Design a protein with these regions (language model features):
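Alpha-helix N-cap and loop-to-helix initiation/capping positions
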Residues: 39-47, 75-87, 113-124, 148-156, ...
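Active-site acidic/histidine proton-transfer and metal-coordination neighborhood
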Residues: 73-171
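Active-site beta-loop-alpha junctions enriched in small/polar residues
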Residues: 6-10, 31-35, 67-70, 108-110, ...
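Histidine-acidic metal/acid-base catalytic patches
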Residues: 158-287
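N-terminal pre-domain/capping segments
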Residues: 1-67, 71-92, 277-287
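Acidic (Asp/Glu)-rich catalytic clusters
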Residues: 18-25, 43-64, 91-99, 127-134, ...
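Conserved, mostly hydrophobic/aromatic
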Residues: 20, 66, 84, 95, ...
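A general structural detector for well-ordered alpha-helical segments in enzyme core domains, enriched
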Residues: 16-19, 47-54, 87-94, 118-129, ...
């Protein structure tokens, strides 16, 4: 597992590598543009080359891009779907340029209609974005289970992948907090193992490409997407120890998206706390 954190690209893409290194990250996650604006940040071949050179010289082994929050691939609004497609395609092309492990996407939301039409619209946008980019994987994130959000269980994610063509570039991102507030008890090895078995059966672990590591500030099954710092939430140290040491997660980028002690995102202590829990968990599993 490559433990890391979400970091800023302020001042240029390559700066994210330095920030990740300062935090002790083995992987990083970035936004390819402001997450709350449609206007894309323009990068060119020189930016991509600088990023790759910085990464080659750093302890950071993997980078994941998170698509902007404004995207709703399932929207009935044609213009919103057009903007969503353009933004998602832009993210995938940047992923192509920097060699990203994937672009993480919140698939979208259904509003005031049956699930079927929303799923079909989302799948169409996803397929179009993949067609208009080269090789970067697109990773559908399991959402927190709130009614109306697509990807709120493994069945939905599997169906969405099938509707979008089941291509090899389509993958999965699991978030510890989202799973917990969905109602999946992932706080001990036995229960987590059953959840991973279900993910394998319904989606396939060959599609699991990255993880988000967050404690939960809301109770099990609450469907409330509220992240807490490592070991400070409802999952606690024991729960995250189990998640971080799951053998089938080995080798995956694992990004912290925690608030951090100063509410400015994860800091070095948060990253080190996650690494320590992983070591403790691996030791327990060997006993």
């Amino acid at each position: 597992m490559l433990v890391g954190a979400h970091v800023s690209t302020a001042g240029g893409l390559a700066n994210a590598i330095e920030r990740g290194g300062d935090l002790g990250c083995e992987s990083i996650q970035i936004f390819n543009q402001s997450p709350r604006m449609w206007r894309p940040t323009k990068y060119g071949p020189g930016d991509f080359a600088e990023f790759r050179m910085a990464m080659d010289a750093s302890p950071v082994e993997a980078v994941v891009i998170h698509a902007v929050y404004l995207i709703n691939c399932a929207s009935k609004d044609r213009e919103l779907r057009r903007k969503s497609l353009a933004s998602l395609t832009h993210a995938l092309r940047i992923g192509d340029g920097i060699g990203a492990s994937g672009v993480v996407l919140h698939p979208g939301a259904q509003k005031g209609e049956a699930l079927g039409p929303s799923m079909k619209r989302a799948a169409k946008v996803i397929a179009a974005a993949l067609d208009d980019s080269d090789r970067c994987p697109l990773l559908l994130e399991q959402t927190a289970g709130h009614k109306g959000l697509l990807g709120r269980d493994f069945d939905q994610t599997a169906e969405l992948i099938e509707l979008a063509g089941s291509g090899r570039r389509l993958g999965l991102c699991l978030d510890s907090c989202h799973l917990f507030v969905q109602g999946y008890d992932v706080t001990d090895e036995e229960h987590l193992g059953k959840v991973v078995d279900e993910a394998d059966e319904k989606v396939g672990l060959d599609r699991l490409r990255c993880l988000h590591v967050n404690d939960a500030a809301a109770p099990l099954g609450s469907c409330r997407d509220r992240h807490a710092n490592i070991g400070k939430g409802e999952m606690g140290r024991a729960g995250l120890r189990a998640f971080l040491s799951e053998p089938r997660f080995d080798g995956l980028p694992a990004t912290l998206e925690t608030p951090g002690p100063s509410r400015k995102g994860p800091d070095r202590k948060e990253v080190q706390a996650a690494k320590r829990l992983r070591r403790e968990g691996l030791e327990r599993r060997r006993q």
